[in-house]
Amino acid sequence: MQKMLVAATVTLAAAFSSFATVASAANRDPLDGRTLGIIETRFDKLMDLANKHDINGLHRMFWQSPSALLVAKSAIPSEGSWAGFWGNDAIDQKLHDIAASGPVVLTPDLSKLKVVGLAPDVAESYAPMDITVSYAGQDGTPKPFLMIITWKKVAKDWKVASEIILPVPPAPVARPVQQSGRRS
């Protein structure tokens, strides 16, 4: 009986051990720390080019594909307030229009920049930031945004496959709580 108990314990321990190994492998980032650091450096370069209004440099940062995407403020009412711009020609035109509108300053909170691997050739970055821009009715005061980028490895370089810029809505105004009067 004791031998059966020991055998069952060893079998269960082996089963749980292999389950833990499979679970930890599934949760491991598919990109190593060095690669994630390279993508962080590419993010810094993207911010630098945007702040310099270097449209040609920004063009080279994007994946050259009709599937490349930029989500940004639209100046055309029929597109809605925010719209997706697909393909490099549309992205280049949108970036040109934004840069031509006046000063544009992107100030990311690098302490909150997060880069994760999704696959060996795909990563995603997230960064809250303030953006100062006078494009499409924006008043040129810094406002909070979130920038979410999907990075795609092309040859030996990491390119922006999609860049989604989302405005952070203002916090709701707290309304005073009305207390009902007590009757004695």
What are these model-predicted stretches?
Residues 1-4:
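Positively charged n-region of N-terminal signal peptides that target proteins for export
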Residues 7-18:
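Bacterial N-terminal signal peptides
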Residues 17-61, 176-183:
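Short, low-complexity N-terminal intrinsically disordered segments enriched in polar/charged residues
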Residues 33, 37, 55-116:
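A solvent-exposed, acidic/Ser-Thr-rich amphipathic alpha-helical stretch
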Residues 95, 110-115, 129-131, 146-152, ...:
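Hydrophobic/aromatic beta-strand elements that line small-molecule binding cavities or substrate pockets
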Residues 101-102, 131-141:
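Short, cysteine-centered beta-strand-loop-beta hairpins and adjacent loop/turn segments enriched
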Residues 115-123, 138-139, 151-157:
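A short, structured loop/turn motif at beta-sheet edges
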Residues 143-175:
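Short beta-strand edge/turn micro-motifs at domain boundaries
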